């Protein structure tokens, strides 16, 4: 009967632990869903893992979008899967914090007689510290949840940035092909004129050099596209046949109405999960600080029962008590260490807040500068280049300029288009970095994990 009861108790503890683990990761997953529109999946050998694998394969069969690439990473990135285990470790710490230490049983048998001495001791002081330890461990669990959530959001932003970087490199590669074709045509025309004796050696060499440079630029652009594709492969965690995904080769246009950038610094301070994690770490440290010194002194306080049986058969039973005497170590080192750790966490919190504000300003300025370049290029530079092409075509038809001049003007137009695409790529990459710096959406309702009202500074 006792064995059955023990088994039931262990089973109940396991079920409660699994339920708490699901709830903890569910909090993180829901926050990620609200901030990214995508749900994270923790692969732990559950039936949901098989469904996630099927969904992953279906995503990779279709042309990838930024959102689809983020979803692939949340399902398949192994570094993220390793990060998810931090929640399991922190949850185990909560369970351990709620358990009493095992009692100690000692027995002594003296030969050749029948004298027997037995003692059962337990650290009774653990019962007093149990609630405080659990509160501190729960604060550390909340910190772990926030750290995991921050890593997920960081990875999602990195995937978006890598996606737009690769998409831009593909588009630049297509323009590089046009430049190379124009340079090849110009070099071929120069060769024919040179063979007919109508152009100088210097002119032919110049056109051939321009063609060679265009080929080098094209090779460099293609190498960048391969490199950015591998970067995206790594972030999504794909390999083998999974890397045969496709993607649209053109960047999307920037939104007509740019999002407001006022208040982004304050928004980042409110919703950055790594900052929330530091708040909970400091809260856990503050909760444990109050009893750490007393625990250091009283941790050897033991109470129990003592049994002695003498040789003639007489025996005696009575209580046993062991009390440490704090003559030398009365917890001063533990207290100083705990206070230093708390101050350290407070300074890290303040330092991270300063860094976050700086990151937001830098990413915001990069995004706005790139947007200004895109708008100026589309409204002024490209239309002007188009007019120059039209005028040059008319002059070429009237035999007022040479074919080389016409091809040169065409190359300059393509180069202007390349600069516009680079600015467009930089805009989307900077926007993804700004979302990472802000810790989520750039507008709308502030979204947070459930937080304690207590903060690092006790406000």
Predicted regions and their residues:
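Terminal intrinsically disordered/low-complexity segments used for targeting and assembly
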Residues: 1-72, 222-267, 435-459
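Periplasmic alpha-helical coiled-coil/stalk elements that build and connect Gram-negative outer-membrane
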Residues: 3, 132, 139, 146-267, ...
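A small-residue-enriched
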Residues: 19-40, 67, 71-126, 229-238, ...
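Long, charged alpha-helical "stalk" segments
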Residues: 46-47, 83-85, 226, 278, ...
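Amphipathic alpha-helical coiled-coil segments and their boundaries
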Residues: 66-69, 76, 83, 123, ...
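Short segments within alpha-helical structural elements
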Residues: 184, 213-240, 348, 353, ...
